[in-house]
From Swiss-Prot:
Source species of the chain: Shewanella frigidimarina (strain NCIMB 400)
GO cellular component, one term: cytosol
Pathway assignment: Cofactor biosynthesis; thiamine diphosphate biosynthesis
Entry protein name: tRNA sulfurtransferase
Enzyme Commission number(s) of this protein: 2.8.1.4
Annotated gene: thiI
Localisation per UniProt entry: Cytoplasm
Pfam families per record: Rhodanese, ThiI, ThiI_fer, THUMP
UniProt keyword Transferase present: yes
Keywords for the protein's UniProt record, in alphabetical order: ATP-binding, Cytoplasm, Disulfide bond, Nucleotide-binding, Redox-active center, RNA-binding, Thiamine biosynthesis, Transferase, tRNA-binding
Disulfide cross-links: 346-458
Length: 484
């Protein structure tokens, strides 16, 4: 079984040299992602497409490959195909007949062909010949060119015939690392998750900077969001997760800064701290989830004052999006339920925030602030490769027991994503297994029977351990990690 990866149209519009560079990078990215699924995956780059070969002895990997390819930036769509050789137009029909005979029985159909290469026929010739043959020699209701029940999709490339099994919509955008790196200021809320995704999709290697205002529980929740975004959409490249202990900064702002200016000052201090981190790693821009008028600090006047705190470019991909549109996007990318369970800390420090900050007044207030405190908190920041979150979880799950056997009365919660759980459901004799995806567990766990003990399960143990840590931080003691 093969997949034909079609490049995003914007890539095809580039000059030859740029298109070749982008295509090479996409090929490498696909290989990096799929080798984590199976080392036997083969990836071949052609002029306008990339061919992915599923190991012939592992057809069960088709669905996994399809899921991964659908989330790699730079892909317009993917078609899963069966490959055949042919020597004539009749040979094409003879191979299509047994393939589609049962599928089109009792239904209307049409044939659509895409062809490239040198042949003594064109695409329309094939559509007519194959369509006519299927119409005469099957029990189909007939040909219907508009809105048929079944569309027979064929692709021809030189002497190869590809019968399309299914079409998978791609992510679009540009291949990862075709653009410069960015540093996303992530809080775990709706906005920062979506803004991070937007730059991953656009081909920028997106690192994460987290200003910790809420302790270990807050950090665990944000790490889940960042790890999810990286694992699902950016796994081809390693990125950094930087955690900055910002409680001392908030404490000093509360003590020294005028109440109305607190929100703007906090954002300016965050930008200066993030700039220091970005400069250290050669990152050229900051990304925030700010949206015009959403909160008091996000008026044009205040955003202008915030921008004056740094010379580094600040990018705001959500600036004109409505809140509901942002929430809808977070639902699509899988961060909505994370965001629901993570409180917004920045908004609680200013009771009467200004919406028209004056730069001179803000700068005067900042004279009360210890500038070297920024250097101290940045120096104490914890920087980690996001891939090491798994190892960190293995070390930190000390308060949560890890078990390989299920005791009487214990319930397993399968926290895998729905498509993974459906593909290979966890079935254990005489044991209740509840399927609650990891991104819903934080909001649904409180509704479960508190007298029961719950064992969290996922394939690799990363999300189950993250969720266990998060629940322990919330005060739950009836949770363990299940690693059979």
């Amino acid at each position: 079984m093969k997949f034909i990866v079609k490049l995003y149209p914007e890539i095809m519009m580039k000059s030859k040299s740029v298109r070749m560079r982008f295509t090479k990078m996409l090929e490498t990215n696909i290989r990096n992602v799929l080798k984590n699924v199976d080392e036997g995956a083969k990836v071949q780059r052609l002029y306008d497409r990339i061919i992915v070969q599923v190991p012939s002895d592992k057809p069960e990997l088709c669905d996994v490959f399809a899921d991964r390819l659908a989330c790699i930036p730079g892909i317009a769509h993917v078609v899963q195909v069966s490959e055949y050789s042919f020597d004539s137009i009749d040979h094409i029909y003879q191979q299509a007949l047994p393939k589609y005979r049962d599928e089109i029985a009792g239904k209307t159909f049409c044939v659509r062909v895409k062809r490239s290469g040198n042949h003594d026929f064109n695409s329309i010739d094939v559509e007519r010949y194959v369509g006519g043959g299927l119409n005469q020699h099957t029990e189909a209701l007939g040909v219907k060119l508009k809105d048929p029940d079944v569309t027979v999709n064929l692709e021809i490339n030189q002497d190869k015939l590809y019968m399309v099994e299914r079409r998978i919509q791609g992510l679009g955008g540009f291949p990862m690392a075709t653009q410069e790196d960015v540093l996303s200021l992530i809080s775990g809320g709706f906005d920062s998750g979506v803004s991070s995704f937007q730059f991953i999709k656009k081909g920028a290697r997106t690192h994460y900077c987290f200003f910790n205002l809420g302790g270990a529980q807050h950090e665990i929740g944000v790490k889940q969001v960042a790890y999810h975004l990286w694992k699902k959409y950016g796994e081809s490249h390693k990125v950094r997760f930087v955690s900055v202990p910002f409680e001392p900064v908030v404490e000093e702002i509360l003590e020294r800064i005028d109440n109305g200016q607190m929100g703007v000052v906090l954002k300016r201090v965050m930008m200066r701290a993030a700039t220091r981190i970005a400069d250290k790693y050669g990152i050229q821009a900051l990304v925030t989830g700010e949206s015009l008028g959403q909160v008091s600090s996000q008026t044009l006047t205040n955003l202008n004052v915030i921008d004056r705190s740094t010379d580094l470019l600040i990018l705001r991909p959500l600036i004109a999006m409505d809140k509901q549109d942002i929430i809808n996007q977070s639902r699509i990318i899988g961060t909505e339920d994370f965001a629901k369970s993570i409180p917004e800390y920045c908004g609680v420090i200013s009771q009467k925030p200004t919406v028209k900050a004056v730069l001179s007044k803000v700068e005067a207030e900042e004279l009360k602030f210890s500038e070297d405190l920024i250097d101290r908190v940045v120096a104490s920041a914890v920087v980690m490769d996001i891939r090491d979150i798994e190892a960190e979880m293995n070390q930190q799950v000390t308060e949560t027991e890890t078990v390989k056997d299920v005791a009487s009365g214990e319930i397993i919660i399968d926290v895998r994503a729905p498509e993974e759980e459906e593909r290979s459901p966890l079935l254990i004799d005489n044991v209740m297994v509840k399927a609650i995806p990891f991104f819903k567990l934080a909001t649904q766990f409180a509704d479960l029977d508190k007298s029961k003990t719950y064992l969290l399960y996922c394939d690799r143990g990363v999300m189950s351990k993250l969720q266990a840590l998060y629940l322990v931080e919330q005060g739950y003691t009836n949770v363990k990690v299940y690693r059979p």
